C-alpha cells in the first residue's frame, strides 16, 4: 500500500486523525498459491530482488518504517492456524527458497517460517512501541454469495475452534525472551 489516501487526508487538513495499520499477512502467506507473486510485487515496491529470508526481512523493515512515517502505531495479523515452531535462520531461509521455487511445504515448515517472521516483526513493533493485534483462528469467507460478489476477506468470517494456546504461548515467549514482546 502506498498510503496515498492517508497522506491526502493529512495534507487536506482533515480534522480527524486517520492512521494506517500495518497488515503484512501476504508476506506471511507462504502456504498460499500467490505467495511468489506477492514477493515479486514487494520486490518491485522496495526496488531490489527478494530472494532470501534476509532480503524479505529487510523489505518488511523498510515497509514498517514507511508506515511509521505516515503515523502507523498498530500492526494487524490474521492467523488462521497454529503458528509457531522454533527454527534457525538457515532453516527458514531454505523454506523460503523452497516456496519461491514452487515446491510444496510441510505443515511444520509453514509454522517455522511464520513463527520466525512473526518474532522478527514483533521485535520491530516493540522498538516502535506499536501494538501487535493477532486475530487467530478465523474461518474465512463463509458466505459464498458475498464472496462471489465482493471477493475474499470482505468481512464474512467467523471464529474457528482450533487449539492454539501452546503455540501462541511459545510465540509470545520467543518475542519476550529478548525483551522484545510488543503490546499485544
Model-derived features with residue positions:
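Short, conserved acidic/polar surface loops in the N-terminal third of protein domains
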Residues: 5, 31-33
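Phosphate-/polyanion-interacting regions in eukaryotic proteins
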Residues: 10-14, 21-28
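Histidine/acidic residue-rich metal-binding segments in metalloenzymes
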Residues: 2-15, 38-183
Amino acid at each position: 500500500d502506498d498510503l496515498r489516501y492517508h497522506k491526502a487526508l493529512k495534507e487536506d487538513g482533515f480534522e480527524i486523525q486517520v492512521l494506517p495499520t500495518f497488515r503484512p499477512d501476504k508476506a506471511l502467506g507462504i502456504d498460499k498459491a500467490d505467495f511468489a507473486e506477492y514477493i515479486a510485487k514487494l520486490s518491485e515496491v522496495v526496488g531490489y530482488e527478494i530472494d532470501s529470508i534476509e532480503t524479505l526481512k529487510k523489505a518488511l523493515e523498510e515497509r514498517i518504517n514507511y508506515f511509521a512515517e505516515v503515523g502507523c502505531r498498530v500492526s494487524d495479523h490474521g492467523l488462521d492456524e497454529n503458528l509457531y515452531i522454533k527454527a534457525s535462520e538457515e532453516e527458514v531461509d531454505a523454506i523460503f527458497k523452497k516456496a519461491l521455487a514452487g515446491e510444496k511445504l510441510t505443515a511444520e515448515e509453514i509454522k517455522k517460517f511464520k513463527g520466525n517472521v512473526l518474532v522478527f516483526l514483533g521485535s520491530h513493533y516493540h522498538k516502535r512501541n506499536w501494538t501487535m493485534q493477532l486475530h487467530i483462528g478465523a474461518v474465512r469467507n463463509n458466505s459464498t454469495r458475498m464472496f462471489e460478489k465482493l471477493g475474499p476477506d470482505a468481512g464474512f468470517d467467523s471464529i474457528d475452534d482450533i487449539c492454539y494456546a501452546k503455540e501462541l504461548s511459545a510465540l509470545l515467549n520467543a518475542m519476550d525472551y529478548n525483551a522484545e514482546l510488543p503490546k499485544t
